[in-house]
Amino acid sequence: MIDFANFYQLIAKNRLSHWLHTLPAQLHAWQHDNLHGDLPRWNRALNKLPTTAPGHIELQRGVEIGNSQSLSEGERKKVESLLRQFMPWRKGPFTVHGIHIDTEWRSDWKWDRVLPHISPLAGRYVLDVGCGSGYHLWRMVGEGAKLAVGIDPSPLFLCQFEAIRHFTGGDQRAHLLPLGIQELPDLRAFDTVFSMGVLYHRKSPIEHIEQLRNQLKDDGELVLETLVVDGGVNEVLVPTDRYGKMRNVWFIPSSAALKLWVERCGFTDVRIVDENMTSTDEQRRTDWMINESLSDYLDPADPALTVEGHPAPKRAVLIARKAKD
């Protein structure tokens, strides 16, 4: 069973200490109430991962731990077999002792689009909402974050994160908690809050933006990445049923509408810093994620459209600053 005691001890000494009023009870409930049928199997795989000396750790140009010479061929095959127990791997990629985990998403490409526009992360307390397997948490640590906290309710993502952390030697600068943002109190403690690929899954996008604001300290920075459509300030796509075969897509605004939403929620210096069409090179089926991917969600006769006839995925990155309360 995954133990969160190290995180409790860590935040007891810093600006997040007030989180301890609610967090231990929430995570205790999660550990005892989570009924995902594969969780025992994933826990067994975590417990079987061998202890290795991490040696080389690269977190600035990617997430690369160890090298291909640090394990024997037999050990490497065992580690790869155990890591494959956590498929599908969606967010990455990772390289562990020469084993390349080729994830569905090239999350490093997204990071390369975001990084030039954000305030330096050195010494910052950072929250990543909907962090998936925690790939970007490690990149945040690579940029010098004092503490990178990710939240995502998926037990598989938590196990993937713990598998990677295991090979770092138990690095305590990054932590993933199996929670949704609606379960967080108003911490008002983070210097930077990221929400990437989450907003369009929320039934109330305004409420989500306000929840993000309530995690930031005054003058803190919001980094918001989401699907957008072309159009003016009043343009918002609400799919009648599915978008790219996903049922849980609710609101896809234009970049101008997104900017207005964020301004209305009490942010200043709001700006769109990047727009990018998602390509089938960035999101695709791999040997580590063998299910359907982006190419299956697009109209085969016109890849500018989804199979439902909506505009194909286009993503915008927005940066904003929290105005003082």
UniProtKB/Swiss-Prot annotation:
Belongs to the class I-like SAM-binding methyltransferase superfamily. CmoB family. Carboxy-S-adenosyl-L-methionine binds at K91, W105, K110, G130, D152, P153, S154, M196, Y200, R315. GO terms for biological process: tRNA wobble uridine modification. Disulfide bonds: none annotated. It is an enzyme of class 2 (transferase). Keywords: Transferase, tRNA processing. It holds the Pfam family Methyltransf_9. This is tRNA U34 carboxymethyltransferase. Catalyzes carboxymethyl transfer from carboxy-S-adenosyl-L-methionine (Cx-SAM) to 5-hydroxyuridine (ho5U) to form 5-carboxymethoxyuridine (cmo5U) at position 34 in tRNAs. One of its GO terms (molecular function) is transferase activity, transferring alkyl or aryl (other than methyl) groups. Its EC number is 2.5.1.-. It comes from the Bacteria. Homotetramer. CDD domains: AdoMet_MTases (cd02440). The keyword Transferase applies. Gene3D superfamilies: Vaccinia Virus protein VP39. NCBIfam families: PRK15068.1, tRNA 5-methoxyuridine(34)/uridine 5-oxyacetic acid(34) synthase CmoB. It catalyses: carboxy-S-adenosyl-L-methionine + 5-hydroxyuridine(34) in tRNA = 5-carboxymethoxyuridine(34) in tRNA + S-adenosyl-L-homocysteine + H(+). The lineage of its organism: Bacteria, Pseudomonadati, Pseudomonadota, Gammaproteobacteria, Aeromonadales.
